[in-house]
């Protein structure tokens, strides 16, 4: 979640008056950043992860699990931890962890550091341990040395954590990513109540059912006007309720997401959801469901919280230059649907099993601010897959940008006039075709030479599967791209594996000069396929057959084929078949001549990716679905009741604590 500005937000009728002003000045801010930083070069590639979690309150007597609405109290306590220990060098901690092989001792170190890192570092002799990660520049903060940071998210039951500084560019940096994630979880645990758990699950399986919050609150709020989610689940910072209300007001009706129900043996057919309060007349929008917004045979959701209340795993890369960032943006775009399918973790919504496994289309619907008229002319929600490639690489052929794209013509003309190339200008004009959703009255007048707030107002509320991020004014941060499609995983081991795999793939793309370009329409088709229940086994995905530099491009139409996830990651078992992304990543790994310990660790992560792709172990979605459908109290009616939900949460917590399940984690952990 981006920077939260303090001030007085405008409601939608007032905001509309300033939309053109914000767009005009946002473009001016972009031009100033571009002119200032276009020549900026970075010595090394840096990266970082964002992990979101849900805080669950467990009631062992009633066997109920509910989301805890104590985000503000928890973050205040975590903020004090950060401030208290921000001068501590965590380097010796990671050195000690890297040299330890006993799982119990590793856990003990993490537990001690989570309570008081200063005491632990002093006890082991401070910086005397020589086995630390080499830092390129001693003047720059590094994830190894910094206290982790914690941030608010949309839901009052959610937390976001990041390393306190970026990871470096060496393979050795990968050896403490998982420890950093585990430490963040331990720190959070230390600031929770005894009955609370921080779980990295994509969504709470009974979100929106009666009594799902702790404390219990009735769903009758005027902000979202939801049948199911009380306004109390929304972060109290004024940005979030304003965003929620302004999306509803701009579109002229409540948001509406309909996910197909999974039909089991005893599921009601046709499924006309009995939990929808069809006759409620508390707000004018209550008629939406009766008027067709709620579809039969689907799970109906009517609030932004059903989407923005989901957790995900995001990776940000700092490139060496603007050109390299644009190339990475393009080359990783075809990877986004593949990683969405491989990370699938969302088989249930609002207490029902769904006939899909991913969150993406639910979030897209949750922030879809298009009016009914715009639905006919604007193809996508502002949260969706990438629409345009943006690099000037000669392999970026015009025919690859083959989907209709709405742009703001005035913004485009201004960018072209100021010497921005056509591809980047079109991308920015597309981003600026949307309206700004939250405008603060205190922040309308800005100095465009020192502020990027108007630019970020639009860039940060276009939630695409990749995001292009210019350097912010007055910082030493470089040109960045953000990989946004992955679902959060249950364990820190999995989240580290997925993060490191994507980072290594990005390095391989640059190192081997790979060409992954394909028509955007095929990427869109892949995004839809990724949502399918058990997409890994039931769907095929378009991809470029030969990504290597020496591949012929004479017949572009024959360059793309549909492959299974197994074939895409593990390769085709035939002559001249696709080698597999894992083969490419391994080639990069061994070209770097890492030490044996580093190879051993990274191979564990690669094996998890490989086994997920070939079905030797399950995706989180399949594992959760299997748990639900085999639970003694499951009635084959698609309902995830309180008992199932409670037991599932308990089982997940045990796995996180080390009671590994080979069906989920394979033989890698």
Swiss-Prot record:
Keywords: ATP-binding, Glutathione biosynthesis, Ligase, Nucleotide-binding
Record carries keyword Acyltransferase: no
E.C. number(s) listed in UniProt: 6.3.2.2
Pfam families found in the cross-reference section: GCS
Matches recorded under InterPro entries: GCS, Gln_synth/guanido_kin_cat_dom, NA-bd_OB-fold
Molecular function terms from GO: ATP binding; glutamate-cysteine ligase activity
Cellular component per GO, a single term: cytosol
Broad EC category: ligase
Listed pathway(s): Sulfur metabolism; glutathione biosynthesis; glutathione from L-cysteine and L-glutamate: step 1/2
Catalytic activity reported: L-cysteine + L-glutamate + ATP = gamma-L-glutamyl-L-cysteine + ADP + phosphate + H(+)
Keyword Ligase in annotation: yes
Membrane-spanning intervals of the chain: none
GO biological process, any: cysteine metabolic process
General function of this protein: Catalyzes the ATP-dependent ligation of L-glutamate and L-cysteine and participates in the first and rate-limiting step in glutathione biosynthesis.
Assigned protein family: Belongs to the glutamate--cysteine ligase type 3 family.
Subunit structure: Heterodimer of a catalytic heavy chain and a regulatory light chain.
Protein name: Glutamate--cysteine ligase
Species annotation: Schizosaccharomyces pombe (strain 972 / ATCC 24843)
